[in-house]
UniProtKB/Swiss-Prot annotation:
It comes from Ovis aries (Sheep). One of its GO terms (molecular function) is hormone activity. Residues 65-85 are annotated as: A. The lineage of its organism: Eukaryota, Metazoa, Chordata, Craniata, Vertebrata. Glycans are attached at T106, S154, T163. Residues 53-64 are annotated as: C. The keyword Disulfide bond applies. This is Insulin-like growth factor 2. Proteolytically processed by PCSK4, proIGF2 is cleaved at Arg-128 and Arg-92 to generate big-IGF2 and mature IGF2. Residues 160-179 are annotated as: Disordered. The IGF2 locus is imprinted. Paternal inherited gene is expressed, while the maternal inherited gene is imprinted, hence silenced. Interacts with MYORG; this interaction is required for IGF2 secretion. Interacts with integrins ITGAV:ITGB3 and ITGA6:ITGB4; integrin-binding is required for IGF2 signaling. Interacts with IGFBP2. Residues 86-91 are annotated as: D. PROSITE patterns: INSULIN (PS00262).
Length: 179
């Protein structure tokens, strides 16, 4: 009951296959240079973009650029991802925070003059100056004042009365002497 040569050869081949798989898993990563490095960075980083040197927050004294890291030394996925740019998030980007409204939600108008399309941005309000309804109110007030002024001019007396009292000038009128 000894081990035959065929069984020992089978065991040796199985061991070599297992050893080669383990070595392939733990071997150093490959090096990337030039166009291959750029293509790999574009694939890994996608729309975020990438840096050839790390951002200033990650710099230490012995920091190297990605070319020195990946072309002359080994390079792996984790190292490549450290050179990806952070996605720029706009302050007005609200796509991440979606508000779910109930199905029975109805929007009621706030007021006649404060519709959302007329009051979009403060810069537009400043460019427009006074809102139309305030200009109309001011115009109505000015129109009333002008009408009152015209009415006062149209109702002038037919005879112009003296502005000063005749008694103060020293002249006596005939009515004052007969009393």
């Amino acid at each position: 009951m000894g081990i035959t040569a065929g069984k020992s050869m089978l065991a040796l081949l199985a061991f070599l296959a297992f050893a080669s798989c383990c070595y392939a898993a733990y071997r150093p990563s490959e090096t990337l240079c030039g166009g291959e490095l750029v293509d790999t960075l574009q694939f890994v980083c996608g729309d975020r973009g990438f840096y050839f040197s790390r951002p200033s927050s990650r710099i230490n004294r012995r920091s190297r650029g990605i070319v020195e890291e990946c072309c002359f030394r080994s390079c792996d996925l984790a190292l490549l991802e450290t050179y990806c740019a952070a996605p720029a998030k706009s302050e007005r980007d609200v796509s991440a925070s979606t508000t779910v409204l109930p199905d029975d939600f109805t929007a009621y108008p706030v007021g006649k003059f404060f519709q959302s399309d007329t009051w979009k941005q403060s810069t537009q309000r400043l460019r427009r100056g006074l809102p139309a309804f305030l200009r109309a109110r001011r115009g109505r007030t000015l129109a009333k004042e002008l009408e009152a002024l015209r009415e006062a001019k149209s109702h002038r007396p037919l005879i112009a009365l003296p502005t000063q009292d005749p008694a103060t000038h020293g002249g006596a009128s005939s009515e004052a002497s007969s009393d």
